[in-house]
Every structure is written in C-alpha cells, then in structure tokens.
Swiss-Prot record:
The gene is pyrG. The lineage of its organism: Bacteria, Pseudomonadati, Pseudomonadota, Gammaproteobacteria, Pseudomonadales. UTP binds at S13, K186, T187, K188, P189, T190, Q191, K222. L-glutamine binds at G351, L379, G380, M381, Q382, E402, R469. This is CTP synthase. CTPSs have evolved a hybrid strategy for distinguishing between UTP and CTP. The overlapping regions of the product feedback inhibitory and substrate sites recognize a common feature in both compounds, the triphosphate moiety. To differentiate isosteric substrate and product pyrimidine rings, an additional pocket far from the expected kinase/ligase catalytic site, specifically recognizes the cytosine and ribose portions of the product inhibitor. It holds the Pfam family GATase. Keywords: ATP-binding, Glutamine amidotransferase, Ligase, Magnesium, Metal-binding, Nucleotide-binding, Pyrimidine biosynthesis.
Amino acid sequence: MTRYIFVTGGVVSSLGKGIASASLAAILEARGLKVTMLKLDPYINVDPGTMSPFQHGEVFVTHDGAETDLDLGHYERFIRTTMTQNNNFTTGRVYEHVLRKERRGDYLGATIQVIPHITDEIKRRIIKGAGDADVALVEIGGTVGDIESQPFLEAIRQLRVEVGSKRAMLMHLTLVPYIATAGETKTKPTQHSVKELRSIGLQPDVLICRSDHPVDVSSRRKIALFTNVEERAVISLEDVDTIYKIPAVLHAQGLDDFVVERFGLQCNGADLSEWEKVVDAKLNPEHEVTIAMVGKYMELLDAYKSLIEAMSHAGITNRTKVNLRYIDSEDIENQGTALLEGVDAILVPGGFGLRGVEGKITAVQYARENKVPYLGICLGMQVAVIEFARNVMGWKDANSTEFDRTSGHPVVGLITEWEDATGAVEVRTEASDLGGTMRLGAQECLLEAGSKVHDCYAKDVIIERHRHRYEVNNKLLPQLIEAGLKISGRSGDGALVEVVEAQDHPWFVACQFHPEFTSTPRDGHPLFSGFVKAALAQHQKKA
C-alpha cells in the first residue's frame, strides 16, 4: 500500500518545497523504496502551457507529452522515476473534468459543490498519480492561507483520515528568519503558520525550517513545543552552495529514519554515495569555461531552469566549472556582438514570438563565422537554419512563418501533420488553439553516423522530448542541403528535421528537441557533455 507525504509551505512562497521534497524522495529511493512525486497547482489555468515564462518560469515537458510545472524537473533530477501527466494537475484541470462530467449528466442532477465533488476529484487524481509506489510525496503549490489552496488542503485532510495515520503524514516548510541586529532566529512566523494549518484540521508531522542561518537546538525545541511536533522532526535547512547537498543534510538530521519508522517500512539504510560524488565534482572542478546563453526571458532565469541545471550537470561530468554569461538577445540587436567576445561557446535556447529573434540570428552568425562552439535548442535550431539561408545561401528574406508570413523563403514553417509517440496522426492548422496543440513529448530521432551528434550519443536511434509547432520547411530542404547544411538527425518516420550541423566547424550542433528535460546530476546528458567538452577545447586553444 502506498504511503503519502503531503508537503505544504507557509509564511512566504519560494521556500523550495520542490527541492526539499525531491531531496527526501532521493533519500527514500536510496533506501531501496519505490518513490514517486506529485505537484498540485492551485491556479485556474488548465496547464502552464500557455502561461508567460516571465510569470510561471519554465514549462517542463514529461515523457508522455504533458506540459507541467518546473518542479517536475526537480523531481526527475533527484529520483529515477519518470514523471507523467498524472504527476501534475491544476485547479483548472480539476474543474474542467468535473464540469465535463456535469454536462454529461454523470452526477444525476446533483448540485455540484467544492465538497464533495471537487475534493473527491482531487483525491482521485492523487491516488491515481501515486500508482503502486511505496511512498508518494504530494506537494501542494502556493502558501497556506491562500484562498486558491483551500480545496487542495481540504482534500488532503480528508485523505489523511481515510488512509489513516500509518499511511499519511504532513511535512510543512516554513521560514525562520534571522534578525541580524538581534543576532537570533525568530520562530513566531513558524508558530503562526502552523496555527493556520491547524485551524483547517491539519497537524504537521514534520517541520522543515528554512533559514539563511542554522536553526539552533533551543529554537527547534521552542518550535516543537508550540507546534505540537516531535523535536526530532523539526529539521533545520539552511542555504547551501549546491542543492545536491540537501539529501545529505536531511539524512544527517534523521528525517528519512523518522519517515520510515512512522510508516513501519522495512528497508535498507540510505546509500548516498552517488550524491557524494556529484557534490565533490560540483565543488572541486579541474577546469573552467565561459558560455554565452543568448535568450529572451533573461529577467526570470527560472524560464530556463532545466537548461541551466543541464549545463551544471555537464560541468559535473567534465569536472569543469561552467560560467554562464546570460545575454538578452535584444541587447545583441542594440549593442552588437561585442557582448559575445571572449566566450568559449554559445548556447541559444528555445522561445516563442518575434521579439529578440534577430539578436539570436546574429549570435548564430557570430558562432558560425568565428568557429565558436554552438548549441541551438528548439528555436535555437530554427534560427540556425534561417541564418544559414540568409548568409550562406544569400536568401536575405529567409525567415520562419511564425515571424513573417510573407517571406519569399520560409525555411521554417508550421507543422500541419505528424505522428505522436503512440503512432496516432496529429493535425494542426493556423486556427488551432494554442494550449496543448504542439508536438509534445518523447519522439524517436534517427542520427547520421559520423556526425557530431552521433559522436555524442554513440547511438543510431535516440528518444528526446519535444515542444514545438514549427519545423524546417521540407520544400526548401533540398536546396539547403545542396548549399552545405548538414542534416544529422531526422524524426523516426524521416519526415521532420531534428538536428542540423554546420560543416567545416569544430562543433556546431542545433536540435529541435529539448535535451535538457532528460539531463540529471548523476548521469548528465551526452549532448551537453559534448558541448562543454567542445567549449573546453576552445578555451584551451585560446590559452
């Protein structure tokens, strides 16, 4: 039977519930347990797919093609379980399902209410998402006291009663601020946060106290006294220099022992040797490179969360400190390529819309002409094709129909038909809804032997995740190839371009898929590892 750990947050948002939850999950997995994780988002959007990156941050794409919260990226980086569409749902998704049932008449004329209909649907989805795992950690987004969170908190209150105290526990993250002028940490915000929880029938079993200073024994004892939580279950979690230290921090305070004892689970001790190796490689690099990341959402770096982490992982696997120089593509449009001088490699990530595209194209041209290693992802591949068409082939009006529908050389256009991961045919038009209509999820890609990308993967066939609705225009592809553009990867059916490379260049690879979604700190990712190796070679050549 599955045991549930419900995770809530109080006092302020952005305390790191996702990372703390994933770290505990990593320890439990290291003890031999089958672990999964869920994220419940209280916002009304059906999913984050159409939300602005400036508001929501990254949209993480699962293997089965769900557009989900970025916390699922943390989950997959910390545990081996692959997330699916069942591991993340929103208020909007819940209401959409309940209202569809009401329209069908499934409720037989009953008055639809938050309790029981909405809460029952939330509980059903939690149980479904947990599957057959030994332990499921269920993170509720937002902060206790938010009006949007109330149905979710009520649902987990009910579920705790239904499954019993031996199968459910509540872990609450709070802020314990350090007052420098007083030289002490303050526990009152935590006390009030727990009071808020208890007022709706939820008693925490574990408190994770977030602070920029260690929470001393006397403060933890005081918190335990006023919150009715066991003293050993009051955990101090201060800021660390790498998030991959957190499993060891929680383990050292006995959190996993407390959970295992509480649930009556029989399992081995935690083997955290893999995480020790990750931390050692992260904190003790032997080399250093600087890579320019040219994007359009630089005001909120969470928009590139998985990509930034993937670059860190590549640094770990290469024992190299990767310094990312974040450059807004609009700044290149205004200030020129001087912003790129001195870097060891250039990375252009995905994005949507016309703003900043010309700056990305300029960055591609700089990388190609100056033989600087280049990695383009999604839009980063499309702008590489546009740049090649303009500056190598002389098609000065070359563009994507996303940006210019009147272009005389639309080298990138809307995909109107493709096969999804199950083999079903998907059809789209310009009039299709934006939400959930892209080519999403894991797809096969066939790599050309002898190419740079094949050298990285050392495989003929790979599977990577996608999120796009535009592709290289097959009608103009023969002319692009004839002019020297190397097509080194195609979709499983051969219909779509997946990877392009520049010839006579030390390392220039651009892919339509998103490899960052499958990179992990313990395993890295072959494409990013190859990219950092190329950057390191460039750095050593300059030296």
